[in-house]
Amino acid sequence: MIDVFPGVSSGGGAPSAQGDRFVHDRLPPRDQWPDLRYDRPELQIPDAANLVATLLDGAHARGWGDRPLLRSPARTLSYTQAAAEVNRIARVLTGELGLVPGNRVLLRGGNSVAMALAWLAVVKAGLVAVATMPLLRARELGDIIDKAQPTVALCDGKLLDELRTAQAEHPVLATIVPFNQDGVAGSLEARAAAQPADFTACPTAADDIALLAFTSGTTGKPKAVVHTHRDVLAACEAWPRHVLRATPDDIVMGSPPLAFTFGLGGMLVFPMWAGASVYYPDIAYTPEAMVRLIREVKATICYTAPTFYRQMAPFARAIGLPSLRACVSAGEGLPDATRQLWKDATGIEMT
């Protein structure tokens, strides 16, 4: 048994679609699982549920198809356009690369439209997303490969070197497909462009595995935290609904990477639940740059760490952030002094 911390529920009325039982078979004994309660009406997730089909494909039925979802300086994709791109990538994964539900796929990249599309395609296809922090080196990537045993990786073209070094020591990772490389033969974009824009979502059980989120390893080697489709959908029904009160008019910005569950929620799945949009810049954030981009993009919700809010405060005070209505902090302890400094600068009580 590998070091796995389950976030999975004990429900499970629908049959699993994941023929590859690698993760399922390595979960701890059921009596060691947490007791997760889904007793509120909005948490009555169907026993058969694919989170991407629910959030992305379901956007059309909710009238959000033409609304923007993924935004960057280079392009903006509506919910309908994003769904088509996700479908093409899912076809590459299952048709061209031969992956089957339950297989793990390593994802390596910073926050970008391409990274978001890749993650969504992996999960829609019933595969297990194993997203990794962009700063990880070959040795750290190797530890994750050892535990997750992915045969395929999707990697930002700017981050290939360390992953290729890890691959040389861990041949189970047979294939690396680069993305964010438009016009490059063999890239994910080139492969996807040759595929049709339709794909039937894998009929996953709600308790099938959606992702392995690796811890930072502060108490030893990183451990894999298991999240099911039900877990992610339940989080979407809780946080953006009750805390943020998110709406389709929200524009989300922030610094946490999609490989970090703080970033995955705040910078992708929570906006999707609300029909909102998320903006990924093409520059490295500095405190001043983030403040200026929030003002320029008219972002309404921001996610970052307490240290960054503290550093942003003087710039926010100087130029003002009239569009911003909610600020979420995580990743480290939030000192009361930082909370008060930010409130004095913006009038916003940090969450």
Positions of PLM-derived features:
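Structural core segment of the AMP-binding/adenylate-forming
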Residues: 2-22, 124-191, 295-298
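AMP-dependent adenylate-forming
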Residues: 53-81
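Conserved AMP-binding/adenylate-forming
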Residues: 75-77, 92-139, 257
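Conserved AMP-binding A3 loop
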Residues: 78-80, 203, 210-237
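Conserved pre-ATP/AMP-binding loop-to-beta segment of ANL
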Residues: 178, 195-214, 221, 245-251
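Conserved AMP-binding/adenylation subdomain of ANL enzymes
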Residues: 233-251, 258-300, 315
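Gly/Ser/Thr-rich phosphate-binding loop
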Residues: 299-304, 313-351
